[in-house]
Curated annotation (Swiss-Prot):
HAMAP family: Ribosomal_bL33
Keywords tagged on the record: Ribonucleoprotein, Ribosomal protein
Gene Ontology CC: cytosolic large ribosomal subunit
Family of the protein in this entry: Belongs to the bacterial ribosomal protein bL33 family.
Organism of derivation: Marinomonas sp. (strain MWYL1)
Matches recorded under Pfam families: Ribosomal_L33 (PF00471)
Record-given protein name: Large ribosomal subunit protein bL33
Source lineage: Bacteria, Pseudomonadati, Pseudomonadota, Gammaproteobacteria, Oceanospirillales
Keyword Ribonucleoprotein set for record: yes
One Gene Ontology molecular-function label: structural constituent of ribosome
Single biological process term from Gene Ontology: translation
Length: 56
């Protein structure tokens, strides 16, 4: 059986409060801190800050 890899599935949630999110993965060994990046939110039709959250 293969061992679990270093990549975790994460959810990037919009800081605009619209409830929109993107899913992606990240290498938890190389980037242990939380991700923050500007991405397009189609609900408000603007680029806003997205922050990392756990997938439920």
């Amino acid at each position: 059986m293969a061992s679990k890899g270093a990549r975790d599935l994460i959810r990037m949630v919009s800081s605009a409060g619209t409830g929109h999110f993107y899913t992606t993965d990240k290498n938890k060994r190389n980037t242990p801190d939380k991700l923050e990046m500007k991405k397009f939110d189609p609900v408000v039709r603007k680029h806003v800050m997205y922050k990392e959250a756990k997938i439920k």
